[in-house]
């Protein structure tokens, strides 16, 4: 049975086509701010139990869509699945974030790195993509909203692989980048091949758009960013399947703290660039001059404000972009676990309401 996408607003916005309103989805929209997510995670036993079991991953992917009229679903997974599949021993200690049992710090460590067999080691992710697509589709083949697949960027994965977990200053990985750039580039080359293979597997399984999260690209200096992050994002994009089942598969790239390099990121071959909250959206639109769509960029902490303040800030973001195609509303980073769900409802409603008013010429 042929599938029909009931709401393709998100995909059309990524391709800079006119839309009746501005689509919205949120980074970490399936997460700890939702009581139902916490209940499912408790049943799964752990975060990795949640991410590695397709039925649980499907359940939590759909939870925010049951609460809010969001315009896209995003696969529930983690950016560190690739280094875990490389055998680095990923674990999430309570209250400590991700840790790797076998960080990559020596020549011998780097020599052991290889692109994982995606089907053999990450089949649970592609199984989840297929299961989520089925769950989004009714008995008559009508799919509610598109599904986004994703990966961490080669540099961001390397940050965790070399540090062995999160870091306040990334001194271990940055020291390697400048003291032993040969080792750093070998890690990044393997990572770029792995990210491209991983995203292509998600596309073949049914992801209708993909996003590269370069969470720590902004930790690099100008010059270092181009060598160690941007160049490898470009390599990933060059290897991506951009069409599947006769449809364009848009790609989004997001560098947190990367506003300085917006024009360079827009020139990598992406369809859309994600922006954090430090960037003026209207000026960003002028800077990219219609070459790419833009995604963002409300400060996530605004969701702790009273509802009318949330609505006012949402309007400010929309007004900044103006009545132009190519905007996907999102936060400038992931939603906080402490966010009241009812505040998310206010945001989604205002984005849809006010963007329709802008399109109609009614303003506020």
Swiss-Prot record:
User: Which gene specifies this protein's sequence?
Assistant: hemE
Q: Which PROSITE patterns match?
A: UROD_1, UROD_2
What are the site positions for Transition state stabilizer?
78
Q: What is this protein called?
A: Uroporphyrinogen decarboxylase
Subunit architecture:
Homodimer.
Q: What enzyme class is recorded for this protein? A: lyase
Q: Which UniProt keywords apply?
A: Cytoplasm, Decarboxylase, Lyase, Porphyrin biosynthesis
Which pathway features in its UniProt record? Porphyrin-containing compound metabolism; protoporphyrin-IX biosynthesis; coproporphyrinogen-III from 5-aminolevulinate: step 4/4
Is Cytoplasm set as a keyword in this record?
yes
Q: Please state where this protein is localized.
A: Cytoplasm
């Amino acid at each position: 049975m042929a599938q029909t996408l009931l709401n393709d607003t998100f995909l059309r916005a990524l391709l800079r086509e006119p839309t009746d309103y501005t689509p919205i989805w949120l980074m970490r929209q399936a997460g700890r701010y939702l009581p139902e997510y916490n209940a499912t995670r408790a049943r799964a036993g752990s975060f990795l139990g949640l991410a590695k079991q397709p039925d649980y991953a499907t359940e939590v992917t759909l939870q925010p869509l049951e609460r809010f009229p969001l315009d896209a679903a995003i696969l529930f997974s983690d950016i560190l699945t690739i280094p875990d599949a490389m055998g680095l021993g990923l674990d999430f200690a309570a209250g400590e974030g991700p840790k790797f049992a076998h960080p990559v710090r020596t020549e011998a460590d780097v020599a052991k790195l290889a692109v994982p067999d995606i089907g053999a080691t990450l089949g649970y992710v592609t199984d989840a993509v297929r299961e989520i697509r089925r769950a989004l589709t009714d008995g008559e083949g009508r799919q509610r909203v598109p599904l986004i697949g994703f990966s961490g960027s080669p540099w961001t994965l390397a940050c965790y692989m070399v540090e062995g977990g999160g870091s306040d200053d990334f001194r271990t990985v940055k020291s390697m980048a400048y003291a032993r750039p040969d080792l750093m580039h070998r890690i990044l080359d393997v990572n770029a091949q792995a990210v491209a293979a991983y995203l292509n597997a998600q596309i073949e399984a049914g992801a209708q758009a993909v996003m590269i999260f370069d969470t720590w690209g902004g930790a690099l200096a100008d010059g270092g960013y181009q060598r160690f992050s941007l160049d490898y994002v470009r390599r990933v994009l060059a290897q991506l399947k951009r069409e599947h089942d006769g449809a364009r598969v848009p790609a989004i790239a997001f560098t947190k703290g990367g506003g300085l390099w917006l024009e360079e990121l827009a020139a990598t071959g992406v369809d859309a660039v994600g922006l954090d909250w430090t960037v003026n959206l209207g000026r960003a639109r002028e800077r990219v001059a219609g070459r790419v769509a833009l995604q963002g960029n409300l400060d996530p902490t605004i969701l702790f404000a009273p509802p009318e303040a949330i609505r006012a800030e949402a309007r400010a973001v929309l007004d900044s972009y103006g009545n132009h195609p190519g905007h996907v509303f999102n936060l400038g980073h992931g939603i906080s676990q402490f966010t009241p769900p009812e505040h998310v409802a206010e945001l989604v409603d205002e984005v849809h309401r006010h963007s329709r008013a802008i399109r109609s010429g009614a303003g506020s």
